[in-house]
Amino acid sequence: MKTLIAAYSGVLRGTGSSILSALQDLFSVTWLNRAKVEKQLQVISVLQWVLSFLVLGVACSVILMYTFCTDCWLIAVLYFTWLVFDWNTPKKGGRRSQWVRNWAVWRYFRDYFPIQLVKTHNLLTSRNYIFGYHPHGIMGLGAFCNFSTEATEVSKKFPGIRPYLATLAGNFRMPVLREYLMSGGICPVNRDTIDYLLSKNGSGNAIIIVVGGAAESLSSMPGKNAVTLRNRKGFVKLALRHGADLVPTYSFGENEVYKQVIFEEGSWGRWVQKKFQKYIGFAPCIFHGRGLFSSDTWGLVPYSKPITTVVGEPITIPRLERPTQQDIDLYHAMYVQALVKLFDQHKTKFGLPETEVLEVN
């Protein structure tokens, strides 16, 4: 209001310079407010995914069970009936929706960090692929944004390639959450699903496996570049059985967005985490990011740190119906070497010193 009064006063005095100055002040205030709104939209878009990841499945399960005890019980019956008939859909690649993958909310999600996808080589649509994604981080936010949405234009960068991000099969037993995940092209990380996608779904499929899994998330912390890979060879065996090329993929900055309490080996905290990992498939982490309204407080919103996912050169894999351990070890060693090479080639571009070494555990 003061700005408008100043402009009007300038008109009365006949001073054009005052009018121009007042209008400039007005536009600067408008753009400042717009920038704040934009930032809050980014924060909200990230928070909705974090909450979906953490509590949507459990919350919807509780609500659905409660609905059985209300006048709306028919809704619960209809959904459970649908669930029975649709139970195996996730194992066949799910039910992706390009509309959901192109939601504007994912662009706000991308810009919050920001997240970018770097392509180094073309992929042939006549081949199938298994991407090894590293590191896991706390939630694999880079993997989700790059391969389960179109925010970083994965379909334009790799035309004709259908990405499937693989995650815990238990997520697809959760009502509503399973629909949400499938709409983004997310599938269970189990042998049945991967066998189907690599043998009965044509060519041009790319299955993204976060190789380190829950074990790797336990060591996720800012400033650490380490992968759990030395004894992870199942994905190599699957690639050999189907002749699917292996693609090393490293996400710089994935470990920077959350801080967590690291329990020492042998401590009670680590014992609890390993038991959860063994029997349930995930390891509970004590972590924090920033608050919803301030970066100076703790909360569930990840820190705004750049995440850059670099997709490396595919390793051509022959098809062997019964690969021997020697075959698996050979191509696993080739994969590890390719991943380390990819890390070394790009580390200085994203803020790491030349002396930084990728730790392979």
From Swiss-Prot:
One of its GO terms (cellular component) is perinuclear endoplasmic reticulum membrane. The chain crosses the membrane at residues 43-61, 66-85. Residues 1-42, 86-361 are cytoplasmic. The keyword Cell membrane does not apply. The keyword Glycosyltransferase does not apply. GO terms for molecular function: 2-acylglycerol O-acyltransferase activity; diacylglycerol O-acyltransferase activity; retinol O-fatty-acyltransferase activity. It is a multi-pass membrane protein. GO terms for biological process: cellular response to oleic acid; cholesterol homeostasis; diacylglycerol biosynthetic process; diacylglycerol metabolic process; fat pad development; fatty acid homeostasis; glycerol metabolic process; intracellular triglyceride homeostasis. It catalyses: an acyl-CoA + a 1,2-diacyl-sn-glycerol = a triacyl-sn-glycerol + CoA; all-trans-retinol + an acyl-CoA = an all-trans-retinyl ester + CoA; 2-(9Z-octadecenoyl)-glycerol + (9Z)-octadecenoyl-CoA = 1,2-di-(9Z-octadecenoyl)-sn-glycerol + CoA; 1,2-di-(9Z-octadecenoyl)-sn-glycerol + (9Z)-octadecenoyl-CoA = 1,2,3-tri-(9Z-octadecenoyl)-glycerol + CoA. Belongs to the diacylglycerol acyltransferase family. PANTHER family: DIACYLGLYCEROL O-ACYLTRANSFERASE (PTHR12317), DIACYLGLYCEROL O-ACYLTRANSFERASE 2 (PTHR12317:SF14). This is Diacylglycerol O-acyltransferase 2. It comes from Bos taurus. The lineage of its organism: Eukaryota, Metazoa, Chordata, Craniata, Vertebrata.
